[in-house]
Amino acid sequence: QQNSYYIAEHYLSMGYHVLTPDLRASGLSGGRYLTLGYRESEDIVLWAKRVAEFYPQAKIVLHGVSMGAATVMMAAGREDLPSEVVAAVEDCGYTNADELIAMQMENSFGLPAFPAMNLLNWRCEKVAGFNLHDAAPIDAVRHARVPILFIHGTKDTLVPPNMAEQLYAAANAPKKELLMIPGAVHAAASQADQQTYFRTIRKFVQPYMEEQK
């Protein structure tokens, strides 16, 4: 959440209002289980709709980091995304959860993807009611309804940089841009090169925030 506040401060400095909700099963939000962005994307859409109810002239930019980025990408591809959402910024999100977890199992614990992933998926379905295959931002961005800015650090060892390239290539957004931050590790691009990070965001989102409805 500290990272969220750091980023929020920069949006505030651009003159925007900021809402930083905790995702389900995190912080002050309810729920028992994370779904790696799958059901969280439903929550974000509901938050956006709620904002639009109170502020009919609102223009909303979704910004997420890591799992938040996966959530934002999946929200961007949802048919029920409200028209008040005009752009999205994803920072170090993954292509799909099952591929990422399988890779980390092998790299960090030396476990083969099979049968470990089958067992994990069975457990997720039984306990949390979702399939890891459902958490697939790369499928969502193929149906993106808003412009997306993709950001990733070149030294990210948790979510490999090539995932950002795959997401960018797959995205069928009205507009898209890819920013790679040299030397940045996972979820630290905004600190590694603050000037480039926020300058690029401002340049990307500003035209959509200033458009007349």
Regions of interest found by a model, annotated:
Residues L34-Y55:
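Alpha/beta-hydrolase active-site loop
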Residues Q1-H10:
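The serine-hydrolase catalytic nucleophile loop
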Residues H143-R145, F150-H152, D156:
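Short beta-strand/loop motif that positions the catalytic acidic residue
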Residues A169-A187, Q194:
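Catalytic histidine neighborhood in serine/cysteine hydrolases
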Residues A192-K213:
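Catalytic active-site module of serine/aspartate enzymes centered on a nucleophile-bearing elbow/loop
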Residues P137, V146, P160-A169:
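Short alpha-helix in the alpha/beta-hydrolase fold that links the catalytic acid
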